[in-house]
């Protein structure tokens, strides 16, 4: 989450996590393009409007959706976890941009890590909580 300078452009970094997904997000002044793992964002997210809305939410909260290009490297999990990880990473990068951005992003919940993850399987059970059928006699 450091800001660095490359070729006279300032880059803002943020890392987001959700379930088993980890996203490293870079914000670069630009036109609002989203690139995920080298592919256009809408292609990577299968044109799913819910995923696209989640990725764009932090920028739209601050009214900066056309001001910054979003470059993402994401791995692990599925598209739902990856989209929410990108959302959190973008929000953290926007906090690096300006300290004033933190409060509206916090109110909208974009900075909060969602702790829900798959519960581990316990021995003696078929799944995390599903028990084998009980027979009284």
UniProtKB/Swiss-Prot annotation:
Compositional bias (Basic and acidic residues): 105-117
Keyword line: Ribonucleoprotein, Ribosomal protein
SUPFAM superfamilies in UniProt: Ribosomal protein S5 domain 2-like
Source taxon at top rank: Bacteria
Biological process terms in GO annotation: translation
Disordered, as annotated region: 105-137
Transmembrane residue ranges: none
Residue ranges with Basic residues bias: 118-137
InterPro entries reported for this sequence: Ribosomal_Su5_D2-typ_SF, Ribosomal_uS9, Ribosomal_uS9_bac/plastid, Ribosomal_uS9_CS, Ribsml_uS5_D2-typ_fold_subgr
Family matches, as PROSITE patterns: RIBOSOMAL_S9
Single Gene Ontology MF annotation: RNA binding
Gene Ontology cellular component annotations, sorted alphabetically: cytosolic small ribosomal subunit
Stored PANTHER family: RIBOSOMAL PROTEIN S9, SMALL RIBOSOMAL SUBUNIT PROTEIN US9M
Family, similarity comment: Belongs to the universal ribosomal protein uS9 family.
Name under which the protein is recorded: Small ribosomal subunit protein uS9
Species name: Prochlorococcus marinus (strain MIT 9211)
């Amino acid at each position: 989450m450091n800001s660095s300078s490359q070729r006279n452009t300032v880059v803002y970094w943020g890392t987001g996590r959700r379930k088993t997904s980890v996203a490293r997000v870079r914000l670069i002044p630009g036109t609002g393009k989203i690139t995920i793992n080298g592919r256009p964002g809408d292609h990577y997210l299968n044109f799913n409007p819910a995923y696209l809305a989640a990725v764009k939410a932090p920028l739209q909260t601050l009214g900066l959706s056309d001001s910054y290009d979003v470059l993402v490297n994401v791995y692990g999990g599925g598209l739902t976890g990856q989209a929410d990880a990108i959302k959190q990473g973008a929000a953290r990068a926007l906090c690096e941009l300006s300290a004033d951005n933190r409060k509206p992003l916090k109110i909208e919940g974009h900075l909060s890590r969602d702790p829900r993850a798959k519960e581990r399987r316990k021995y003696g059970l078929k799944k995390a909580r599903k028990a084998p059928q009980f027979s009284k006699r």
